[in-house]
Amino acid sequence: MTNLNASQANHRNFILTGIPGTPDKNPWLAFPLGFLYTLTLLGNGTILAVIKVEPSLHEPTYYFLSILALTDVSLSMSTLPSMLSIYWFNAPQIVFDACIMQMFFIHVFGIVESGVLVSMAFDRFVAIRNPLHYVSILTHDVIRKTGIAVLTRAVCVVFPVPFLIKCLPFCHSNVLSHSYCLHQNMMRLACASTRINSLYGLIVVIFTLGLDVLLTLLSYVLTLKTVLGIVSRGERLKTLSTCLSHMSTVLLFYVPFMGAASMIHRFWEHLSPVVHMVMADIYLLLPPVLNPIVYSVKTKQI
């Protein structure tokens, strides 16, 4: 019990930083962030509304797209409000429990998005492999259970993280190097060994995001094998074009994450705080903004 309360006894709040070295420009950064937030809500809200009111879009593909849009909105609502409070209202403080809650939701919705992308990849495979039985295979019940399974997995793997953080003592700086709370940043402020936290975080990344990448690649290999079996070249290209939106979304989500992870691993000691901040922001902020644009441009039904 003493260890569990140690962090709260030492730090009752954290200080979230804006972009390092630009305190005078922080208010101006609120405008593009506010624009991104508004664009995210409008874009994903429009996707949800169009799918709801248009009967021709009541198909498995668009139900999965609705889940993706809801996830994007939830992820944005977990990050952007705290960023706006820093840049717009100059209110960088966040209480310890609120920081842990924000960290929990950011990681949960990040893993949910990864799981939804895997589901959408196999949705494309089923649609191409068994077009005549597509709707009968991916029924409403199957889609609902898939969504519940994706959310349950995310909650279960992230659930221990708040308790691991609460067991750490924070007796030095309480300044976080980001505009929102993340597990890796919070544990770096601890004045005790974080080996367990680091090991658990690595396990989560490998067995969630890593596994999801492999499953997505597998689905595309199976899809490509099916497409190559189509005799007509025109039909092959037409079939492949139905996967472009999903492929773009996958690249938007995984490439920034892998790029950031690679750079941090190789150049950790030489990277400036600004680079850390920008990489994290690209990974968390851009996909929710760009996903509805990608689907609107590349999906003529929407």
UniProtKB/Swiss-Prot annotation:
The chain crosses the membrane at residues 28-48, 57-77, 102-122, 142-162, 199-219, 240-260, 277-297. One of its GO terms (cellular component) is plasma membrane. Residues 1-27, 78-101, 163-198, 261-276 are extracellular. InterPro entries: GPCR_Rhodpsn, GPCR_Rhodpsn_7TM, Olfact_rcpt, OR51/52/56-like. It comes from the Eukaryota. It is found in: Cell membrane. Glycans are attached at residue 5. Keywords: Cell membrane, Disulfide bond, G-protein coupled receptor, Glycoprotein, Membrane, Olfaction, Receptor, Sensory transduction, Transducer, Transmembrane, Transmembrane helix. It is a multi-pass membrane protein. GO terms for molecular function: G protein-coupled receptor activity; olfactory receptor activity. The keyword Cell membrane applies. Disulfide bonds join 99-191. Odorant receptor. PANTHER family: OLFACTORY RECEPTOR 51H1, OLFACTORY RECEPTOR 56B1-RELATED. This is Olfactory receptor 51H1. The gene is OR51H1.
